[in-house]
Amino acid sequence: MDFFRRHQKKVLALVGVALSSYLFIDYVKKKFFEIQGRLSSERTAKQNLRRRFEQNQQDADFTIMALLSSLTTPVMERYPVDQIKAELQSKRRPTDRVLALESSTSSSATAQTVPTMTSGATEEGEKSKTQLWQDLKRTTISRAFSLVYADALLIFFTRLQLNILGRRNYVNSVVALAQQGREGNAEGRVAPSFGDLADMGYFGDLSGSSSFGETIVDPDLDEQYLTFSWWLLNEGWVSLSERVEEAVRRVWDPVSPKAELGFDELSELIGRTQMLIDRPLNPSSPLNFLSQLLPPREQEEYVLAQNPSDTAAPIVGPTLRRLLDETADFIESPNAAEVIERLVHSGLSVFMDKLAVTFGATPADSGSPYPVVLPTAKVKLPSILANMARQAGGMAQGSPGVENEYIDVMNQVQELTSFSAVVYSSFDWAL
């Protein structure tokens, strides 16, 4: 006791220092674990966001292949290439029989009758045959361009729709999380952390309900919004084809069906056609494809009525209105025009690689992805048209699990991925 009394101040000071050190260390540890937990939650949230984004793109790819035949079948029917070819062949047969007769006889008298039989074809018949060749040229080229553009617009619009919905559902889940936190604090409960909810699958559940049983996705609204893809599949592609046909007429009508083209000449004609489709009024100002992708406002309820599973009245409510307005804003943006242009360009690149075979192209060198075409090679236009006609089948075929080289290449366009990421991460949109 005497020792304690003599050193009371020192002992108290030592105890105070020890207690302060303990409290300080405990505070530092708590702060450390708090920061560590926050970083872990943020990392988990980013990983879940990335997973949801990637899953969204895979869902879009599947949807594209599921819808492809619904879009390309009427396009193929609009352009009866095989029917025109059959009519041309039927007009060749009499001439072929005359030529066969000419080659099988040595009589000069018989030989003199051949021009008489040949000239028996009326001027009207010759004009009809010429017109058929013009029709075959326009129809074959218009079909190829319409299919490439239809594929590109289907990819663009499906990605846009599903990323808008995916982002909206993600933001709704975050709002629901914040609400859970506020309710937990008000009742004196400890609200689950962001990381806990992520681990529980709160942000990974795409079925439409949270782990707390609250609906965070409105399936009826989603279905109404997705119904607007009907417009491209049934109406939009028609105006798209008309836009393509006008460009094809302006570029290709001066080209004779009997012309011989080099690969560079063909590439230049293809490029001019794309330019007129994308920029029909001003080369420096591309037109958007809003009228091909979304209906005018006065026809929106008509589009909603096309959904047989929706028994409710076809009314565009406030939330759906905001979704459609945002979709239109994205379509009219300069970034969207660039993405669609790049999608079409990538599809036409595959198309040109296939046509290069007609020019006797050799396989690409190891340092170049493109086939090697002799600059002096010339090919008659009918041979080029025949190859174009074969490519249409590859552009049009598609269903989940079936490969389509054109769709695969377009889906890999970097500008499309970047645009999808911008859409998915635009969290400032009002819910």
UniProtKB/Swiss-Prot annotation:
The chain crosses the membrane at residues 11-28. Pfam families: Peroxin-3 (PF04882). GO terms for molecular function: protein-macromolecule adaptor activity. The keyword Membrane applies. It is a single-pass membrane protein. It is found in: Peroxisome membrane. The keyword Membrane applies. Residues 1-10 are peroxisomal. Keywords: Membrane, Peroxisome, Peroxisome biogenesis, Transmembrane, Transmembrane helix. Residues 95-126 are annotated as: Disordered. Residues 29-431 are cytoplasmic. Residues 112-121 have a biased composition (Polar residues). One of its GO terms (biological process) is protein import into peroxisome membrane. GO terms for cellular component: peroxisomal membrane. InterPro entries: Peroxin-3 (IPR006966). It comes from the Eukaryota. PANTHER family: PEROXISOMAL BIOGENESIS FACTOR 3 (PTHR28080:SF1). Involved in peroxisome biosynthesis. Seems to directly or indirectly sequesters components of the peroxisome biogenesis machinery. Belongs to the peroxin-3 family. This is Peroxisomal biogenesis factor 3. It comes from Yarrowia lipolytica (strain CLIB 122 / E 150).
